[in-house]
């Protein structure tokens, strides 16, 4: 049996490493459902077992009463699906069948989970010995005094999502938005209470970060109502599991659906809309939606859905609602297909509050440069737009991937807060508050670099001639050292019979 594990910050990596061995020849896109399914099964079983034991201790014989669990938003787990049974069968050849049957029985007992859980653990290509080892890992999670399985397994689910995004590369955009981008949206919008909506919700990251924000500020998760929609059926299922693990009661519709053609929340007016819709989406069905009520500011072009997504979100905005969304940089300046006119009309309606140009290489899935749009139906600074140029922010965490630091995120959010308070001073090269007359002069193009200018470089006070003499002297010394090293290398190679011509 696997050794007892302490559920500290490194536990997510331990689970990932062990589970990665389990993968074998399966590709990441298929395999993620196996790993995430196991995490989910362990989570709901832990919550059920805790409540079950509580009811046993009360001594009224109510431990098998389903209503006792559903009243507290706990999924009812039938006997054959409880983790203790899974653990007992961990190293039997039929462990895959046992887990599949557990998933089926949980779906039968819980209407909300019907058709959502993965049932593919019995497949021949899944190594059953390694599957048992991963079950052991979960079985032996040892909580610390302040431990909480919901938090630990939630963190693990989130970590594995990010690792799958890394493994899948260009396909990852369907289900995963980098957490630093989501955090930036959330820290700016501050969704403490009200209706939160994401029309392209992927695996539910916007909602998870909103819940974390509320927890950090001692709020109550029940102060927000969560609404989402997702087109991809497997991603929709992942979102349902992700939110359930976090204890977030969400309405993602009864099924996956196309946001443009089957709006599952047609009457919703949200207080906060947050989204990272597909960039520059082509073939989105514009020809069938020419007279749609959502296109208040102009009909979006058939070859690019950027302004269809933006107008869909505006349509669902409450009278005091705010939007925070990720779009490709082309949305800031494009004039093709009537996009310039749509952008102009949205600006004239005084809905745009802030535009942030983001650094490159933030996504696993694309190198397309992106920006953040923030809109507000009740702007505190009417007739003005805040521009932030954050392109120089972030640190490279791998050769190909950049992340915003906590300090970066808080600087962007703090700049926005100061703007709302009316105390923000322009910072050349980083931020500027601009009146609509200036935006009009720029033909309603919203690229932040046009407005914030170039940061002033600090004058070091060293005359140019002296500086060049100093630098060339240093370079000369470096050249001399390189020649010495070259001679030494030649000498050492010659001593063992090799020469460089």
Annotate each PLM feature.
Residues 351-352, 362-365, 369-414:
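C-terminal, active-site-flanking charged/polar segments
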Residues 25, 284-304, 330-339, 359-364, ...:
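Short, contiguous acidic/charged loop-to-helix segments that flank catalytic cores in large enzymes
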Residues 269-270, 294, 304-306, 320-322, ...:
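Active-site lining segments that contact anionic ligands and/or coordinate catalytic metals
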Residues 14, 21, 30-31, 35-43, ...:
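Conserved Class I SAM-dependent methyltransferase catalytic core
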Residues 262-265, 280-283, 333-336, 364-367, ...:
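Switch/connector loops and helix/strand junctions flanking conserved nucleotide-binding motifs
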Residues 171-275, 280-296, 307-308, 327-330, ...:
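Conserved S-adenosyl-L-methionine
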Residues 1-192, 251-264, 357-360, 382-398, ...:
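Non-catalytic, mostly N-terminal accessory regions of nucleic-acid modification and defense proteins
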Residues 124, 146, 200, 228-232, ...:
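Hydrophobic alpha-helical scaffolding
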């Amino acid at each position: 049996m696997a050794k007892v594990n302490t559920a500290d910050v490194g536990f997510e990596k331990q689970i990932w490493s062990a589970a990665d061995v389990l993968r074998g020849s399966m590709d990441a896109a298929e395999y993620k459902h196996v790993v995430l399914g196991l995490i989910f099964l362990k989570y709901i079983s832990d919550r059920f077992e805790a409540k079950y034991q509580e009811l046993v201790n009360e001594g009224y014989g109510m431990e098998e009463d389903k209503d006792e669990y559903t009243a507290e938003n706990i999924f009812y787990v039938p006997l054959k699906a409880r983790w203790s049974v899974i653990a007992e069968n961990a190293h039997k050849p039929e462990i895959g069948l046992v887990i599949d049957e557990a998933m089926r029985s949980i779906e039968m007992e819980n209407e909300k989970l019907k058709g959502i859980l993965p049932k593919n653990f019995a497949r021949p290509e899944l190594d059953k010995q390694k599957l048992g080892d991963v079950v052991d890992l979960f079985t032996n999670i040892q909580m610390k005094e302040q431990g909480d399985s919901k938090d630990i397994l939630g963190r693990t689910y989130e970590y594995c999502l990010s690792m799958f995004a890394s493994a899948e590369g260009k396909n990852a955009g369907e289900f995963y938005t980098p957490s630093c981008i989501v955090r930036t949206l959330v820290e700016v919008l501050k969704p403490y209470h009200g209706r939160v909506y994401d029309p392209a919700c992927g695996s539910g990251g916007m909602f998870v970060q909103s819940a974390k924000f509320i927890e950090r500020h001692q709020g109550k998760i029940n102060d927000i109502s969560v609404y989402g929609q997702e087109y991809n059926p497997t991603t929709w299922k992942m979102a349902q599991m992700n939110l359930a693990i976090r204890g977030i009661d969400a309405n993602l519709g009864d099924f996956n659906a196309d946001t443009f053609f089957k709006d599952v929340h047609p009457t919703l007016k949200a207080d906060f809309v947050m989204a990272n819709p597909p960039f520059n989406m082509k073939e989105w069905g514009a020809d069938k939606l020419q007279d749609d009520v959502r296109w208040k500011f102009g009909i979006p072009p058939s070859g690019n859905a950027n302004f269809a997504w933006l107008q869909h979100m505006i349509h669902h905005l409450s009278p005091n609602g705010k939007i925070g969304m990720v779009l490709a940089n082309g949305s800031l300046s494009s004039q093709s297909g009537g996009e310039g006119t749509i952008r102009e009309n949205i600006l004239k309606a005084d809905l745009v509050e802030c535009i942030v140009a983001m650094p490159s290489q933030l996504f696993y899935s694309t190198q397309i440069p992106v920006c953040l749009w923030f809109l507000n139906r009740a702007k505190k600074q009417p007739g003005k737009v805040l521009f932030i140029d954050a392109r120089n922010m972030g640190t490279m965490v791998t050769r190909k991937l950049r992340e915003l630091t906590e300090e970066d995120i808080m600087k962007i959010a703090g700049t926005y807060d100061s703007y709302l308070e009316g105390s923000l001073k322009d910072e050349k090269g980083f931020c500027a508050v601009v009146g609509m007359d200036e935006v009009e002069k720029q033909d309603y193009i919203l690229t932040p670099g046009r407005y914030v200018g170039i940061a002033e470089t600090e004058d070091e006070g060293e005359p140019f001639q002296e500086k060049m003499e100093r630098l060339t002297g240093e370079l000369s010394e470096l050249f001399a050292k390189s020649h010495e090293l070259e001679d030494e290398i030649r000498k050492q190679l010659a001593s063992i019979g090799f020469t460089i011509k």
